[in-house]
């Protein structure tokens, strides 16, 4: 079985993945190492990062793309989709032989359909953990790590959470809130374990305790959720995920409402901005800047003897 850890960057996915690997899960080889943004390691395979980024860029996207362009019907031609799935399956064939392999790479969230299909074709069962984090904490962490605006960070948070929920409908899944993991990791491991055919172990307790240091949570927010975009999208999604993280029923109607609203607005604004940039970069705008367009209009007015509509 492959247990995919899904969700936005800076939402506790690294901590969840490492804890799972210390409780009986097996990690792929070739991890992305620690850095100043993640001093205890990312616990995501370099090969998966390269593979996902190549797919995203081939289709005009990347990990920080807030759009849902890859959900559009013509995003993947059948031949392209088959090629992507084959490449993912080839990577999965290199995984260590183990009852439970844990894979975390945030871009997988946006490409879950391809990864899940490849995993099943390769003979793996699929289960998922969806990381949940208070949006202000995640947004501040994303903004600080990548030097982006809170608006883009919030859109990324929304997109990845919405896609994680959409793609895992009908798949074994557990919502795990980052704060809950830090508060009582044994409880959260047990919640995950009961959904899996092979029970997780807490035999490496000291290693987990040493890893889950209090300073791991560098962004803390205890106030109300700040909504952006003139909507309740952020707060509504967080409330639904937060409830699911304590085993309450998933609020599917609310999540579907937000998903469809985000999708419609994002698509329309994307088309509008594409047209804007297209016009701004058009030959007409390049050839006729105001210093030239003004005299040209005066010549046309003279040609019409400044009469009628040219008066």
Provide a role label for each language-model segment.
Residues 144-156:
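Lumenal/extracellular "mature" regions of secretory-pathway glycan-modifying transferases
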Residues 194, 198-311:
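PAPS-dependent sulfotransferases, especially Golgi type II membrane carbohydrate sulfotransferases
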Residues 91-96, 163-174:
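A structural motif corresponding to the C-terminal end of an alpha-helix
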């Amino acid at each position: 079985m492959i247990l995919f850890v899904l969700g936005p960057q800076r939402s506790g996915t690294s901590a969840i993945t490492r804890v799972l690997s210390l409780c009986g899960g097996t990690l792929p080889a070739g991890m992305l190492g620690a850095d100043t943004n993640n001093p205890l390691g990312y616990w995501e395979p370099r090969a998966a990062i390269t593979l996902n980024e190549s797919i995203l860029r081939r289709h005009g996207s990347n990990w920080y793309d807030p759009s849902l362009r890859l959900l559009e019907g013509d995003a993947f031609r059948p031949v392209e989709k088959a090629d992507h799935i084959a490449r993912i399956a080839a990577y999965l064939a290199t995984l260590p032989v183990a009852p439970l392999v844990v894979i975390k790479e945030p871009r997988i969230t946006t490409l879950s359909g391809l990864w899940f299909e490849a995993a099943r074709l390769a003979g793996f069962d699929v289960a998922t953990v969806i990381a949940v984090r208070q949006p202000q904490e995640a947004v501040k962490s994303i903004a600080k790590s990548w030097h982006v605006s809170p608006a883009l960070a919030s859109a990324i948070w929304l997109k990845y959470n919405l896609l994680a929920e959409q793609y895992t409908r009908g798949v074994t899944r557990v919502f795990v809130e980052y704060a809950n993991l830090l508060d009582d990791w044994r409880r959260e491991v047990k919640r995950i374990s009961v959904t899996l055919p092979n029970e997780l172990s807490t035999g490496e307790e000291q290693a987990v305790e040493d890893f889950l240091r209090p300073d791991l949570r560098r962004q803390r927010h205890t106030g109300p959720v700040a909504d952006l975009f003139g909507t309740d999208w952020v707060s509504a999604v967080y409330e639904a995920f937060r409830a699911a993280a304590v085993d309450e029923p998933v609020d599917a109607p609310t999540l579907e409402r937000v998903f469809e609203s985000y999708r419609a607005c994002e698509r329309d604004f994307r088309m509008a901005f594409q047209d804007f940039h297209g016009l701004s970069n058009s030959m007409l705008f390049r050839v006729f800047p105001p210093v030239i367009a003004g005299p040209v209009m005066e010549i046309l007015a003279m040609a019409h003897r400044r009469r009628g509509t040219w008066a």
